[in-house]
Amino acid sequence: MSAQPSVFNTPYRAFLFDMDGTILTSIAAAERVWTQWAVRHGVDVETFLPTIHGARAIDSIKRLALPGVDAEAEAAWITEAEIEDVEGVEEVTGAAQFLKSLPAHQWAIVTSAPRTLALRRMAAAGIPEPDVMVTAEDVSVGKPDPAGYRLAAQRLGVEINDCLVFEDATVGILAAEAAGADLLVVTATHDEPIETEHATLAGYELVEAHLGEQGLSLRTI
């Protein structure tokens, strides 16, 4: 946990969560599929894999600008392959219990994954399905664009600047910043320390949610 205390004990109208790397870990499964895809298309795996995390599949493919490649068809292939491979997908420690403790109308998931893939991974990890979930199909532009987080706040009926976003990846952090939300960086799945001005959280077993008259707040245990 970082020494930056500003988001702790601060009341919010809602908590917004990224999915992969924030409430569940699917890095190994995703990298297995993307490695297979990259090799098939002659893309350097070592340099490419770090760029996929937190981004929509179609955006990762379009960014490469490969000649003769149908980005939509390739993204659909990626999604189907990832739906089939959920080996090793599991919750970030304490995430499921923490999410279950939240009022249903005060939290949402905002993910770059398509809805079918998101639900598959959540089921594999034991993550509860929220009333509000923004997925790849819901926005025309993915993270780092802030549209997903703004849409989640809108669907919950709250202002985005009254929300706390839980994120792990650079593109998601940029999206939350651009949206105007407060931010907590979840570091549970990071192999290397992250340099950030935002508060950090190593795992959900270290915190609990408190519902008061002014809103939902995060407290350290």
Question: Over which residues does each language-model region extend?
Answer:
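Asp-based, Mg2+/Mn2+-dependent phosphohydrolase catalytic module
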Residues: 2-13, 96, 106, 115-221
